[in-house]
Amino acid sequence: MWIGVISLFPEMFRAITDYGVTGRAVKNGLLNVQYWSPRDFTYDRHRTVDDRPYGGGPGMLMMVQPLRDAIHAAKAAAGEGARVIYLSPQGRKLDQQGVRQLATNQKMILVCGRYEGIDERVIKTEIDEEWSIGDYVLSGGELPAMTLIDSVARFIPGVLGHQASAEEDSFADGLLDCPHFTRPEILEGMEVPAVLLSGNHAEIRRWRLKQSLGRTWLRRPELLKSLALTDEQTRLLAEFQREYQSEQQEY
């Protein structure tokens, strides 16, 4: 996968390209991230990249000419088929379904805003999609872009040690993940569930699915409303609810 990044602070992306799963993906040639800074497309000695908004008001906007030139340079490098994405609070909220959709793109250009944003005409002429990572304000689009890159990269074949890891992540099937345990078997008096030590893979799968359904019901019940549960899932959720309510009555 090829990703171009338009940012005033490309050095921030070393957190993605130099470390962890995404760092290995870059090292192994599975993920290629390139950068264009609008500052490199300025013509004044101060390398100005911000400008005052028409109509007044607080704050500045990114200057149009350097930003457009940076986007055009990235498009030229990408060639045909690259989607240009602006990280924006006004965009579609990123979720696992959106990540899967974005992961089908082989080429993307991510535009990271700064200041109060970018000129609306640039959005209309240069941007294909707008995406948001949540209903809150950040200082720029770099962190959302890194979030998008990290989440999408997990679906590139070969990036994860076991491709099932991406398929079993929280939200991969619309549910939260089940609890996980490692050694020791007993930690401060709390034991690993016996079923996980049993070696019975069918029972382990059933337990994990039930816990995933139950955790979603407890913590994110709105997610269940959008799912068409199978007969097995319906039974397991009801079983979890009965067990949970019984435990609550004991207290």
UniProtKB/Swiss-Prot annotation:
- SUPFAM superfamilies to which the protein is assigned, alphabetical: alpha/beta knot (SSF75217)
The entry's S-adenosyl-L-methionine-binding residues are: 113, 133-138
Q: Which reaction does it catalyse?
A: guanosine(37) in tRNA + S-adenosyl-L-methionine = N(1)-methylguanosine(37) in tRNA + S-adenosyl-L-homocysteine + H(+)
Enzyme Commission code: 2.1.1.228
Answer yes or no on keyword Methyltransferase.
Answer: yes
Q: Where does this one sit in the cell?
A: Cytoplasm
The family database entries (Pfam families) matched by this protein are listed as: tRNA_m1G_MT
- InterPro entries the record matches: Alpha/beta_knot_MTases (IPR029028), tRNA_m1G_MeTrfase_C_sf (IPR023148), tRNA_m1G_MeTrfase_TrmD (IPR002649), tRNA_m1G_MTases_N (IPR029026), tRNA_MeTrfase_TRMD/TRM10 (IPR016009)
Q: What is its main location?
A: cytoplasm
What is an example of a GO molecular function annotated in this UniProt entry? tRNA (guanine(37)-N1)-methyltransferase activity
Q: Which PANTHER family match?
A: TRNA (GUANINE-N(1)-)-METHYLTRANSFERASE
Q: State the NCBIfam families in the record.
A: PRK00026.1, trmD
The protein depicted here goes by the name tRNA (guanine-N(1)-)-methyltransferase
Q: Which organism is it from?
A: Pectobacterium carotovorum subsp. carotovorum (strain PC1)
